[in-house]
Design a protein with these regions (language model features):
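Catalytic core of membrane glycerolipid acyltransferases/transacylases, capturing the structured
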Residues: 124-141, 261-321
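Non-catalytic C-terminal accessory region of glycerolipid acyltransferases
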Residues: 229-236, 327-466
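Active-site neighborhood of HAD-like aspartate-dependent phosphohydrolases
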Residues: 2-53
Length: 466
């Protein structure tokens, strides 16, 4: 018989945003199993766990705490486990669900491996569609816990032993399996599988992962995004996204009141320059929002810029394949409350097309809006090409006479989703309406103006409309 692969997930700080125990504790209180007790001290303990992860002493205390469960009614514990489900499910990281589905599609078995008592963790594992739940089992007698632990304490090497026993009994090869955990104490399990991943790692696991070359992930963010001290790079660098720190441009922002303060939406802007992403980043920094930018594959394939784009959570688009993967990734980002930024033109127009009064867009933004129901916020950019024209390898840096750059935000649109073509026309018309009057008038450009719309070293036809 051919062995199968499994994807093994830890629970606290891996699948969940924090610890499950505060939620279970409240449910146990409501069912009359335990008293409210604990007060501020308990909150401090849970807060430390959420930020730094588990410690040897805290886990030994957890092991000993099994003795205090003697006499707990199994029926009441089961009721508490079910009562806790809605709050627990709300704490599951959005990209954890995406990752689990990817493993399902590959035919992997899904396994939840946690120190949490089986009576509590089992219903959650079932609700999430896990194939197995490997959790600490407390001894039972006459409808109550008896204060003992039966089998392994599912932590550290005890977790590895539980996984190995289950794998052997179910014809699963750990040499083909994956494991995800936040804890340094799960290193034995991570070392035993083919594909270990440190998720939201505690400091020691983060160091170990770097030394071993294991991937690092945060399941509240898209794959590739890196977090430091609980914050992603976009958030950490936001104070640096200040127009005053860019003396080669004079920025004018208008319509900031049209930017939603929360929830996902699609930001659509026209494309005139390599400087456009900077202008949009400054705009969203003013709004305090995190953004997922759709960009062409050439950006993501570049040695340094590509790495930065992935770390910032950008979405790679390979227009040659026609794949819907970028659309699905953008839809997931919107569902988690992020802003998705798209330039529907797809690229900076060249030649005469750059000066056309009517903007032409691709269908992706309209399709995304129709698929998700997300609002579209149009943004007009003007003057960015004077800072960094397509013909220049680097931006101009004229601090004596910096060009004016206008960033104008319009009212949100709610497209109908019936026709991607018509919705695209609506979006592009809304962007055009935000631009200065001169943008909507026919213009006969000079050869120098045309040359600025082509890449460096271009020697072909200047008056092309492509």
């Amino acid at each position: 018989m051919v062995s199968r692969a499994a994807a093994i997930f830890d629970l606290d700080r891996t699948l969940l945003d924090g610890a499950s125990w505060p939620i279970y504790h409240q449910a146990l209180v409501q069912e009359g199993v335990v008293s409210a007790g604990g007060g501020p001290a308990l909150g401090i303990v849970f807060g430390l766990f959420r930020g730094l992860g588990e410690s040897f002493l805290s886990m030994q205390a957890t092991r000993l705490a099994a003795g205090r469960t003697r006499g707990w009614s199994l029926a009441a514990v089961d009721a508490a486990a079910v009562a806790a489900l809605p709050e627990l499910l709300a704490e599951v990281h959005p990209y954890a669900l995406v990752l689990m589905e990817e493993h399902r599609q590959r035919g992997d078995l899904l396994v939840l491996a946690t120190t949490t008592p089986y009576r509590l963790a089992g219903p959650l594992a079932q609700a999430l569609g896990f194939d197995a739940c490997l959790a600490t089992r407390y001894g039972e007698v006459e409808g109550a816990f008896d204060g003992t632990i039966e089998g392994p304490f599912v932590w550290n090497r005890g977790k590895l032993n539980a996984v190995q026993s289950w794998a052997s009994a179910n014809n699963v090869s750990l040499a083909a399996s994956s494991a995800y955990s936040d804890s340094f104490f799960d290193a034995p399990l991570l070392e035993a599988v083919a594909h270990p991943t440190a998720v939201n790692p505690d400091p020691r696991l983060a160091l170990l992962a770097v030394l071993r070359g294991w991937p690092l992930r945060w399941l509240d963010k898209p794959a590739g995004v890196v977090k430091l001290a609980g914050r992603e790079l976009q958030e950490l660098t936001r104070p640096l996204l200040n127009p005053a720190l860019l003396p080669n441009a004079r920025f004018h922002f208008e319509g900031l009141e049209h930017l939603p303060s929360e929830g996902g939406y699609i930001l659509c802007a026209n494309h005139r320059s390599y400087f456009d992403p900077t202008a949009i980043a400054l705009l969203l920094a003013k709004a305090g929002r995190t953004c997922r930018f759709l960009g062409k594959k050439e950006v993501f394939d570049a040695p340094v810029v590509g790495t930065l784009a992935r770390v910032l959570g950008g979405i790679r688009v390979d227009r040659g394949t026609g794949s819907d993967e970028p659309l699905a990734a953008a839809a997931q980002a919107l569902a988690t409350g992020d802003v998705v930024a798209i330039m529907p033109q797809g690229t900076i127009p060249r030649g005469m097309a750059f000066f056309e009064p009517t903007l032409k867009g691709r269908l992706g933004a309209a399709r995304l809006a129709g698929l998700t129901g997300a609002a579209v916020v149009p943004v007009g950019l003007w003057g960015t090409e004077r800072v960094w024209p397509r013909s220049a390898r680097l931006p101009h840096f004229d601090v004596a006479r910096p060009p004016a750059v206008r960033v104008i935000v319009g009212e949100a649109l709610q497209v109908l989703g019936r026709s991607a073509s018509r919705d695209t026309e609506t979006i592009m018309a809304a962007i055009t309406a935000l631009l200065p009057a001169e943008a909507r008038q026919p213009h006969q450009p000079t050869d120098d103006e045309l040359r600025a719309t082509f890449p460096p070293g271009y020697h072909g036809e200047l008056r092309s409309r492509s």
